[in-house]
Amino acid sequence: MKKIVLLVTLVFSINYSFANASDDLINKIKNIHSMSASFDQKLINGGRASDNISSKGYMSLKKPKFFRWITTTPNNQEIISNGSKLWIYDGDLEQVIIKKVSNNIAQFPYLILLSKNTDNINKLFTVKELDKNTYLLKPKNDQMIDSIQIKFSDNENLEYLAISTSLNQFTKISFSDVKTDIDIDNNKFDFKIPDDTDVIDETKD
């Protein structure tokens, strides 16, 4: 009987710990109403240093639906969403792909930062608190992502986002010069297509 009680207590404690971690994470995300930052992104393919890819740029987001991700080095690439359309622009190729906004976090991990409630995160992930400001998210069903790690600074600014995939790829995005709760014009999240750009509009499919 004591073993059964101990087992039930252990299971309850684990479930409470996961729920508490999820609540803590979502509270931190909820506190980010708008944000801008510079980023340094490193992609490691299969653990081989020779295959590492680094990029830098800047980003901004504004709840409930606006997102802007500008890569400046080594190439000019832009990902911009106004909540209904998503533009993916490659300056070197002079090409823009227009998509409908997806809810697929595997494809667009930034969607976690726009989450408004625990239901979506709890439905998709098991959340574990690694330390006071670091959270590990393990997908319940997604086959593409192995895990997502999110770390906040002591003042609850986003410090880094790390993604491990089933393709043995690891991406770490470190943020600096973070500003939160700032006023950002909605027009910043509409993409103006440059002249002589090849347009692939997938919203009409």
Swiss-Prot record:
Any one of the GO CC terms: outer membrane-bounded periplasmic space
GO terms of biological process kind: lipoprotein localization to outer membrane; lipoprotein transport
Keyword Transmembrane listed: no
Residues spanning the signal sequence: 1-21
The entry's keywords: Chaperone, Periplasm, Protein transport, Signal, Transport
Assembly with partners or alone: Monomer.
Function: Participates in the translocation of lipoproteins from the inner membrane to the outer membrane. Only forms a complex with a lipoprotein if the residue after the N-terminal Cys is not an aspartate (The Asp acts as a targeting signal to indicate that the lipoprotein should stay in the inner membrane).
Family stated for the protein in its record: Belongs to the LolA family.
Protein name per its UniProtKB record: Outer-membrane lipoprotein carrier protein
Annotated source species: Francisella philomiragia subsp. philomiragia (strain ATCC 25017 / CCUG 19701 / FSC 153 / O#319-036)
Gene label: lolA
